[in-house]
Amino acid sequence: MPKESRLQDILNILDEHSPITAEQLSQNLFTSLPTIYRDLRELSRRKLIVHNRGLVQRAQPQTVTTPLDFRRAIQAREKAAIARAAAELIQPGSTVFIDASTTASYLIPELEGLDITVLTNGLVTAMLLKRAGIRTYCLGGGLVENSLAVSGQSTIELVRRFRIDTMLFSAYGISPSGMIVDPSEGELSLRRYILKHTGVSVLLCDRSKFGKTSLFNMAPLQDVDYLVTDAAPTPEEAPVRRQVITVPVP
């Protein structure tokens, strides 16, 4: 992998999961530890990260900004266009699950005025949904490390009380072998459970996430009903069971 691509992958992981250790980065990127350390020195030199006491995290700007704000700024136009298209798959009167991802959070403005009920495991997502006047249930459970999301067995027990018509979620990436992947195990058990029990599943994924590899596999992409993206993937990249929806980005 070219050096600059690897550096960007490190920054992408830190945007989603921070702080993290160099060893975890090495595992997630399938790259030797000495190479990771060289990359971290380069990113530190560029003042893009802070590497201290074995932990790596994104360098903070002088203004106060949440990790969610950082992630929302990445591929913002693509995420907004994808969200608009995904919202059209939601039926009036349905119960919808939206995960804690920033891509899924772009759905919220598109849902205003719809007669739906939304479940979410994202604390910030729940607050934004309620502020938009949408009937919302915020699931309880253990707080995922380095995330404003809850997950775990207690969260799954709560989900079992609901009939979920549509699941809308995102992920760190899609591997070349067609697996939905993530560097953190935190929310995977909840996503896997809902994917098996929802009526319709919709994955929101911009083109920057194709061809990613990471430590944990969530599920085969072919288990998803719809992939909504800003670029048409090859059949090898996206063996989706039903349909790929490609949206133009203004």
Put a short name on every predicted segment.
Residues Q75, V96, V118, L148, ...:
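Glycine- and other small-residue-rich loops at beta-strand/loop junctions that grip anionic moieties
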Residues S105:
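Internal active-site segments that recognize and position negatively charged phosphoryl groups
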Residues P2-E23, Q27-A100, I108-G113, T117, ...:
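HTH-adjacent hinge/linker in prokaryotic transcriptional regulators
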Residues P2-S5, D9-N12, P19-E23, F30-S32, ...:
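Conserved phosphate- and dinucleotide-binding cores of soluble alpha/beta proteins
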